[in-house]
Amino acid sequence: MSSVERIKEYTDIPSESNGYISPPANWPQTGDVELKNLSLRYSPHSSKALDNVSFKVKAGTKVGIVGRTGAGKSSIIAAIYRLSDWENGTITIDNKDIKHIPLERLRNSISCIPQDPTLFDGTVRSNLDPFDRYSDVQIYGVLSKVGLIEECDELCLIFEQEQPNFSSHKLRNRFIDLNTVVKSGGSNLSQGQRQLLCLARSMLGARNIMLIDEATASIDYISDAKIQKTIRETMKNTTILTIAHRLRSVIDYDKILVMEMGRVKEYDHPYTLISDRNTIFYRLCRQSGEFENLFELAKVSFDNKR
């Protein structure tokens, strides 16, 4: 009886609304993102998770989203990825309303690294490249960039390319090889390794927009710094929205979006915000215990971009 009730429960779940306009094959070509007067709530009688949110992100811009728990940070990611429908407002990517884009097309066009990465029962290779589109060299390349294998010089990768029987353990990676077993949910990996694998998978796709929801929260500072360096150096033209607990992770981004109670409170360069004692961001940096370091990093970033 319980099984029948559960089946009935599943059949009654409303389908996700789907779009009907197929964009060009190269969409999104640039990666401009705009939210305009967006309001979202998760149930009819709940308070708004997002309340009249508006901001623009130019193509290639790196935006750090910060705020206290429940401020609406993750709801922004959920809305852009259309995991939740909104009650009013619009989201456009390259001037196209994403509500009109078929869901599969939309989600295949955006890289998303969630708080809890999804990994499948299989191997490292099948998790990174489920459709067998990439060579071992390309896969090893992204594993190296995110720090899951030790730094390997170019000759090593050329060896792999030219000699199919080249022993992959010579790469001295944390995995035995690409056929290393990954259990369902990545239960045989640490939280940090799961997030790093998810980042590597996203990098293989080479999409113009990447959404990162607290992806480095469980990773040590050294690994976090390597990831952020990789993002900046290899994704210069990618539009990135990152939710981060560690202000250091986003202090040298192009913009900081400060959320509070579902509303946008501040949106500017980190140095501009941290220099103003009246901003919420200034207070968050003070409370972090590393204000002086954050201030200096923000200033260097600001000066370099002038």
UniProtKB/Swiss-Prot annotation:
One of its GO terms (molecular function) is ATP hydrolysis activity. The keyword Nucleotide-binding applies. Residues 33-286 form the ABC transporter domain. Keywords: ATP-binding, Nucleotide-binding, Repeat. The keyword ATP-binding applies. It comes from the Eukaryota. It holds the Pfam family ABC_tran. One of its GO terms (biological process) is transmembrane transport. GO terms for cellular component: membrane. ATP binds at G67, R68, T69, G70, A71, G72, K73, S74. Coiled coil: none annotated. Disulfide bonds: none annotated. Belongs to the ABC transporter superfamily. ABCC family. Conjugate transporter (TC 3.A.1.208) subfamily. This is Putative uncharacterized protein YKR104W. It comes from Saccharomyces cerevisiae (strain ATCC 204508 / S288c) (Baker's yeast).
